[in-house]
Amino acid sequence: MTIDLAKVKIEDSWKEVLKDEFLSSYFLEIKFNLINALKNGKVYPPSNLIFNAFNLTPFDKVKVVILGQDPYHNEGEAMGLSFSVPKGVRVPPSLANIYKEIKDDLGIIEPNCGDLSYWAKQGVLLLNATLSVGARMANSHSNFGWQIFSDAVIKNISEKKTGVVFMLWGNYARAKANLIEANKHLVLTAAHPSPLARGAFFGSRHFSKCNNYLIKNGQTPIDWDLNNYTLN
């Protein structure tokens, strides 16, 4: 059995870039693992949102990659974008710390909404290393094979694009730096924004560094102000 590419619900440019991944044996194993997980309980995000990051940020539009670990595992939180939650859901602690850093870095008022779709639509790929999770079980799908897929995403961006900003927060994300050609891109590393890191994330100023780099390379900077999105 193989994967039918026509049935993979992912944006066309990504489907072309990642075609070899979708047709590989490990991706078929991911599919079977997901089918079995769905038989035994709830899986987040909903299947139509698993590739949300790719559908909101086509390959040719990627300017920035923010790498997370796995989706939120509570009902109604995961939406297929790292660190993001839907409108109306309480802002999680790590995202609240990201907002505080943006305020300190750029003077932007902290929004009361956790939906990061506005960033994604500007070219910020909000990628989780693992794209699914079982209900109330953090990292429960970490052995499904998703990391092979997300590593391939990072490698393809690194090899086929130039001038991308990679934000790698925490030890897990920082370990992915070896997948990136640092002479072609900007790799920014810091502690994780989680409160468990005891504030070590603060002062990294990644958001201004990112925009300065994009401008230097002739690209439009990211508008990090989510208030411009939530007011629309």
Swiss-Prot record:
Query: From what organism does this protein derive?
Result: Campylobacter fetus subsp. fetus (strain 82-40)
From the Swiss-Prot or TrEMBL record, give the protein name: Uracil-DNA glycosylase
GO terms for MF:
uracil DNA N-glycosylase activity
Q: What is its EC number?
A: 3.2.2.27
Q: InterPro entries, per this entry?
A: UDG_fam1, Ura-DNA_Glyclase_AS, Uracil-DNA_glycosylase-like, Uracil-DNA_glycosylase-like_sf
Q: Per the record's keyword annotation, is Nucleotide-binding included, yes or no?
A: no
Tell me the superkingdom of the source.
Bacteria
Which keywords does this Swiss-Prot/TrEMBL entry list? Answer: Cytoplasm, DNA damage, DNA repair, Hydrolase
**Where does the UniProt annotation locate this protein?**
Cytoplasm
Q: What's this protein's function? A: Excises uracil residues from the DNA which can arise as a result of misincorporation of dUMP residues by DNA polymerase or due to deamination of cytosine.
Primary location recorded for the protein, binned into one broad class = cytoplasm
Which reactions fall under this protein's catalytic activity?
Answer: Hydrolyzes single-stranded DNA or mismatched double-stranded DNA and polynucleotides, releasing free uracil
Task: Identify which residues the record assigns to the active site.
Answer: 70
Q: Does the keyword Cell cycle apply?
A: no
Q: Name one GO cellular component term.
A: cytoplasm
